Every structure is written in structure tokens, then in C-alpha cells.
Amino acid sequence: MESENIISAADKARILAEALPYIRRFSGSVAVIKYGGNAMTEPALKEGFARDVVLLKLVGIHPVIVHGGGPQINAMLEKVGKKGEFVQGMRVTDKEAMDIVEMVLGGHVNKEIVSMINTYGGHAVGVSGRDDHFIKAKKLLIDTPEQNGVDIGQVGTVESIDTGLVKGLIERGCIPVVAPVGVGEKGEAFNINADLVAGKLAEELNAEKLLMMTNIAGVMDKTGNLLTKLTPKRIDELIADGTLYGGMLPKIASAVEAAVNGVKATHIIDGRLPNALLLEIFTDAGIGSMILGGGEDA
């Protein structure tokens, strides 16, 4: 037992030593985190995520959370007898569904995340893109193999982001938690894919990192091997041959756009792993797939 304790202590010391250069490097920087998947639904992972976010803040990194809520939205739609539909990875959202989306994201999911972070010593504040109208949206029309310009309801894309609200929260020492609902020119609500919001917000905040938490290890090739580094050219090839499809498309598109537009590192990581954020940011090997803005695949 004593030797196990010694090994454990040695491992902890090694981990801290490995983390120190990264803490120094990233202190004072912004990390935008897209929070979704199993990490949002499994109690142990939810608690671990909250602790990790608080730790990031304590070591000087400014985490900004953008959350999804697909399973929770689906559950509520099912309760009211509506079936969730998707086109090219985007949720079809009529007026009734939009009311439910906004209620679930802003009224339940956002508040739960805020409360969890605050329970572990953080100072999280929940906001929606309709607050101060800081996320302006326009209707998103989807192109499918069968038809171009398909209208899927109150689904939007980001037209512009005013980062003043989020920056103000960061300056006050708070952790912003953003529900991905935007506002149209007439004040109407738009459901925006959380990956798209996270990517655009990372660009506008000049974030050091964009981290997208998923239910997979990262981007995989057709044989199931993890691709640790990818360029836009390689991603185009993976889309063309059908390796990437469905719900991965908006995630990948957002990651690529962020990388091309100045976010220093964009990552797709496995949110099912305990301490996934810390493993990516504070270890030499990292985890998941890194999207590069250009050049050749490594």
C-alpha cells in the first residue's frame, strides 16, 4: 500500500510539472468550450466538467462555455408529442418547437450548468444570445442533395456577435455560459447550432483555443483510426468520400472556419473522458483531433 501511495504521489508531481508550462503559456487567454454530448448528461462527467472549468479559471485561463441541449430538447418535444427532425445535422424548428428549444436551453440547461459551476467555487453567469441582442441571427437555408435553399423554420446562422457583454463578464471574473439562441431583425428567436455559435464567438474573442466536446474520440478515418491533426483540404476529402456526415458537418465546418480565421488552436475532443479539458490543455500529448488553419497534415 505504501509503494502505491508513493507511485501515486510521484504521478501527481509529474502531472503538475508537465502542466506548469501550459499554465504559464495560456494564463490570461480565452478558451471557448462547446459543451455537449455525454458530458452534459452523465452525473459524474457533469460534475467533473464543472470542476475542470473552475480549475481553468483559477490558473488564469478565461473559459467561455457555449452549450447544446439536444437530448433535453428531444425529451421535452417527446413529452408534447413532437418528433425531432434533422436536415444535414440541423434541427427543424417550427414556432412551437422554437418555444420549447428556448425554454429548455435558457430555462433549464443553462441554469443547471451555471449552478453546477458555482457549486464548485466558480462565478458563472448564464446568458442567451437574445440578452442585449448580442448574437444577431438570420434565417439559415439548407442545401440538400435533392434541393437547395430548404427552409427548416426558426433556425438561424450567426450574422454578427457583439462581444461586449461576454467581455464584461470576463473582466468581472465571471465564467460566461451561453445558450445558443440568436435574435432576428424583428426580435424573433432563432435556434442556432451551438457549434456555430462557439466557433464564431471564439473568432470574435480572439480565443487561444476552441474546444468542442463530443461523444467520439475525435475525427476518425474510415478504418476507425484517430486523425490527430487535420487541414481544411483533408477535411474536404473526408466529407467528399462520406467519412464525415450528418451532425459532424456543422461541428467540422465551425472548427475549420475558426482555425482559418485566427483561433490559434481548435480541437474536437472526447467529452466521455474524465478531465478531458485538462488532458487537452495541460498535457504534452493532448487528446482528440486538432484542426489546423492551413498547410499540410502532420
UniProtKB/Swiss-Prot annotation:
Q: What UniProt keywords are attached to this protein's entry? A: Amino-acid biosynthesis, Arginine biosynthesis, ATP-binding, Cytoplasm, Kinase, Nucleotide-binding, Transferase
Which top-rank group of organisms is this from? Bacteria
GO terms in the biological process aspect are: arginine biosynthetic process via ornithine; L-arginine biosynthetic process
Q: Which is one Gene Ontology cellular component term of this protein? A: cytoplasm
**Molecular-function GO terms, alphabetical:** acetylglutamate kinase activity; ATP binding
Site feature location: Transition state stabilizer: K34, K251
Matching entries from Pfam families are given as: AA_kinase
This protein's name: Acetylglutamate kinase
**Which lineage do the record's taxonomy fields give for this organism?**
Bacteria, Pseudomonadati, Pseudomonadota, Betaproteobacteria, Neisseriales
Q: Which gene encodes it?
A: argB
